[in-house]
Curated annotation (Swiss-Prot):
Belongs to the UPF0397 family. It comes from Phytoplasma australiense. The chain crosses the membrane at residues 11-31, 43-63, 69-89, 109-129, 147-167. The keyword Zinc-finger does not apply. Keywords: Cell membrane, Membrane, Transmembrane, Transmembrane helix. This is UPF0397 protein PA0141.
Length: 193
């Protein structure tokens, strides 16, 4: 049983990493100097909330590495770590939001929105700019301005695309998993953790 789960998780990571890379390369909207509206981050957040922190971390790390190689020819490890951290932190909210078994209610949307503001400020407003200054000796004002623009663009992206993806998934697949047996209907209980 453990082997089957790890195979499913590996396939999930591979497929979602490919989608993340495609969105990063072809569906990013430039909004400022070195700042783009990343639809791929909205997808990463959706995947992390749906499948958990391990998948979110893996998709964030692998997807960003492949994207950097395709677009720039080299990698910026501090931003790669930030993408992985973003996926990990959003994956921690999997059991609270619980898209697989429950509706994506207004209360959950509000929680997600506040949580994404906190995570964005932490990861792209503090960790990424400080690591740019520390590793690449970038000017302090420039990196914090870029960090601020990235935080705003991510909040906009998650508010538009992330909430839309989660709402559509929840409406189509998340209400109840019904098992029919002998003309009786049983509802699968959600896992506690």
């Amino acid at each position: 049983m453990k082997k089957n789960t790890s195979i499913k998780q590996t396939v999930t990571i591979a497929i979602n990493t490919a989608i993340y890379v495609i969105l990063s390369c072809f569906a990013s909207i430039p909004i400022g100097p070195n700042v783009v509206l990343e639809t791929s981050f909205s997808f990463l957040v959706f995947v992390a909330v749906l499948f958990g922190s391990k998948v979110g971390l893996s998709v964030g790390l692998l997807g960003h590495i492949i994207k950097d190689f395709f677009l720039f020819g080299n990698v910026y490890f501090n931003w790669i770590v930030c993408s992985g951290l973003l996926g990990f932190l959003f994956g921690l909210s999997k059991n609270l939001i619980n898209l697989k078994y429950h509706s994506f209610t207004r209360k959950k949307i509000l929680f997600f929105w506040l949580y994404q503001v906190f995570v964005n400020v932490l990861v792209f407003g503090l960790i990424a700019p400080i690591s740019d200054v520390w590793i690449y000796a970038q000017p302090l004002k420039l990196v914090f301005l870029q960090g601020f623009l990235v935080v705003l663009s991510n909040i906009l992206s998650y508010s538009l695309f992330g909430i839309f993806l989660m709402s559509k998934y929840s409406n189509n697949y998340g209400k109840k998993e019904v098992l029919a047996s002998n003309n009786c209907v049983y509802y699968k209980k959600p896992p506690l953790f």
